[in-house]
Amino acid sequence: MFNLLTEGGVFAKDMLFATLDTTHRVLRLPSGQPAILSDTVGFISDLPTDLIDAFRATLEEVKEADLLIHVRDISDPLTERRREEVMQVLDQIKAGPEHGQDIIEVWNKIDLLGDVQMDKIEERAQASIELEDMMSAFPISCHAKTGLARLAQGIEDQLTAGDEILHVDVPPQQYDVRAWLHKNGHVIKETTKRNGTCEMDVRLSESDAGKLRARHKDLVS
């Protein structure tokens, strides 16, 4: 999934310890906005004691994420048990929904399901998206390369929830503001007038929109 979404070349195989280190790639969201996608170590039941600390160290990065994406093998008969194990580990490192962190689930390997199972999975996934108090789930098949566009849109919807689109007029003498907007926001439209004023429509997170208004409220309309 990581490689398909980012067109990366990360080693991927269904085997123990296939991914040990955290890998980062740029994910281009449907709107064109970039996001950093990190591939962390997988979760393993009954991990040997001497490896627990090493795995925990790599998972510490999880706490810094704006959004967690839990990839599940939905064809695994023990998939619900695996899910509970993951949630327990997240809670132990003070990450996940119990600690105010957004998370979505990706239900991979739907190509291995029968028609009846698939119908039930689709119904559950749709309900999860429509109900705000449920964790959103996105059925995909990396093997068949299906469901990825819907997943990418779901990721963007989660990341941009609460964002604001502001119109900002930046005069020539304050082009440091323009640089800040490019660094911290997603510039949707930008034009420069004859007097040098830069007119910008930019998407900002709620916190960054607040910072902009606090520092330069005269530029925001």
Give the ranges of each region predicted by the language model.
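Short hydrophobic alpha-helical runs that function as membrane-insertion/retention elements
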Residues: 66-70, 189-190
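Conserved G1/Walker A P-loop phosphate-binding module
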Residues: 1-68
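Walker B catalytic acidic pair
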Residues: 40, 74, 109
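Conserved catalytic-core segment of NTP-binding enzymes
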Residues: 23, 49-62, 71-98
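Ordered, soluble secondary-structure elements with a strong preference for glycine-centered loop motifs
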Residues: 14, 48-49, 77-80, 142-145
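C-terminal-of-GTPase-core extension/linker across diverse P-loop GTPases
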Residues: 2-7, 77, 88-221
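Generic enzyme active-site microenvironment
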Residues: 37, 71, 106
